[in-house]
Amino acid sequence: MQNLFDSRIEKLQAQMRKDGLKAYVIPATDPHMSEECTAYFARERFYFCPFKGSDGTLLVTLDGYFIYTDGRFWTEAEGDIKGSSCILMYQGKEGVLSIPQYVKQNNLYPLGLDKKLLSRQELAAYFSDDTHEIRQASYRHMVDDLPELPHDKIFKIDDSLLSTTLEERIKNVLEDTKEHNADALILPLLDDIAYVLGYRGNDIPCTPVFYSYLYLTAEGEVTLFIDKERLPLDFPSFIRVLPYEDFYAFLETRKDIKTLIDPFRTNAYIASLLSHPVFAPSPAFEQKSIKGPVEVRNTKEIQAIDGIALLKLQKYLLDTPIEEIDEYKARIFVDRARRENPRCFDLSFETIAALDDNAAMMHYAPSETNHKTADKNSQLLLVDSGGQYYGGTTDTTRTFLIGKEISEEVKHDYTLTLKSQIALSTTIFEKGCSGHSLDIKAREIMWKEGLDYKCGTGHGVGYMSCVHEGPIGFRFYDRPNRLDNGELKPGHIITVEPGVYKPHKYGIRLENNLLVKEAFTTSDGIFYSFETITYFPYDRRGIDLSLLTDEELQWLNDYHKMTEEVLKPLCPRELLSLLEDLCKEIKR
């Protein structure tokens, strides 16, 4: 019997031949350049490709189909595409051509793609000369049972949870717009819109945004493109509201106005409509990444609440016989533990709960029908999880040592990961540094032993928003269109999550959230440091003390002391002794 995906691809290829196309590209995004998107936009790639991971672009030619994804997903993708004719392209690996390079080298023109799903910069990579014909194309209509766009009501963030008012945020983005000599501003990024307006939605799982476009003029005219029935009764009356689907027609009437758009975060179709585009970074993109005093205070509060949910998971794992621990039950348990707190209104991403060899797949997520159960030889359970709270967004990873015996290799790699995290967390750096400047602090410890993790060391975190937020990140290399090489500034929140991944064996990751803050000023400059704002102890069974320096051991004990102090006031009585035990001083 023919593979289901191969059959679908053959039908797509037949239609491409009729339309005179040699290739077709399906990105994993939507017209707003979202990292995660609603099913209406995501379904096309999942329909034609067996790879289940969230980040991957499909290239379909007349004689094959290729899924491009980065090192976070390679092991998962290798398993997903078995039995199909889909070919995995190891994106980022030396010698592997990018999609534009592959298209050019093989002269796959005319090329079909939806210009609403690529940024202006991404689209430009496919052109070398006028012979490279690119046609506007979409085959989403071939997908069976394509869902509608979401219709749920959006909701307002309480003013007490924000450091700025709606009027101040509008004023700030327009001031930046005027500085670039533009007369209007288009905000297509959903989290930019949510930030400026102070509203949130439920359109994308685990990401509280809503499908819309925001158009602002230098004179203060504000127009939101969204279905009006989705708005609450108290929505500001000075904001003009037009239907979501009217945005492009509206833009045709304003095309001669000098309009600021972000070339990396605005789809190419929007850019093509404007006669006088002003290309500059989105003002909201930078402004929303810097948390004010209210956001910082609230984030620390919900990080403590989050720590209690993980403490409940720790108790569950300790009380459950090892042969009864399974990934799906652990995932459901920690998800429920978070949601028990009234401030938690959603998860911040699909929980990763991975035993042993499954933990080597960085973004593996168990399901009710596809999960693993521990056995007597199991050693570890990696849990990467987070919540959306009224007051912030969390993202924490701990690797729980569940085995009766823990191998020296696992202890070594766990301790190496801890050392890597400590090294970056304790860095002092001068104003002007980006996360790319500092990434080596974490990675050098791994490199000295010939190890490396095929992903960034960390990413910015939003506030009741995207768990992955620019313009900051820790990595030593530039990732096309990731745009995370921004300068680190006080108020930024960023993760640090090094790891060791040994395919088909095990994976270890430890992840904390860091707050950038001012450290001191000297005659030579202004210096910054990090404050760890994740509160949950490490598993001492995984720590090889012979590998820790005295300074690292002191940091670990100080961190555990702080964690106990922060969590104790919130800790249920039945978990108090466990918290004290997990946080007690570690001595050589």
What spans do the regions from the language model cover?
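Active-site neighborhoods and metal-handling regions in enzymes and metal-associated proteins
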Residues: 1-588
